[in-house]
Amino acid sequence: MPRGDRYELRWFTPRCEVKLCGHATLASAFVLMTILEPGRESIPFETRFSGPLTVRRDGALLAMDFPALAPWVCTAPPATLHEALGKDPAAVMQVEDNYFAVYEREEDVRGIRPDFRLVEKLHPAGVAITAPGVDSDFVSRYFAPSYGFPEDPVTGSTHCSLAPFWAEQLGMTSLHARQLSERGGELWCEVRGDRVILKGNAVLTLQGKLLI
């Protein structure tokens, strides 16, 4: 919704409103920049839970300026987390309502077959799994059946935590990430203090008119 030179933005899954959503922000900015306001180089958004966000053109990509949410060590993860994932992680981190299970190898992340019934019973809303990548700096997957989807194809919001975590682990501020869902996706991340720049692309697949 436009408000002055900005747009108000909120995100909803089939079940609830969420605090931050990367792909919906990317898609909103893409539509504004290419259809509603063609030629515009940046779009500022005001959001209910995540404050001001800005999306800018960066060559062929769109760069989203999001808050960094560094994870902390979860000292007492629920036993059902390990049971839900089917393989013990090397470490468990936490950010707000998400757990982050850290594995040692990319193939561990690829091979996880979660029990979504158990994942949904966990108090936090979602579970991300991650590991160092083979042809990227790190990889991840994200499960959130309590939000209304078993596995998210690409999750910008979790990379607000994954990027600071792997930046510290790898001694890098610019990282290339892959999400290993069935559809798959890749992001380019830059950690800048308390902000994370997430870069990706968008493709127009359908256009039409709705008469009200």
Per-region residue spans from a language model:
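Active-site proximal loop and beta-alpha junction motif in alpha/beta enzyme cores
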Residues: 1-20, 24-212
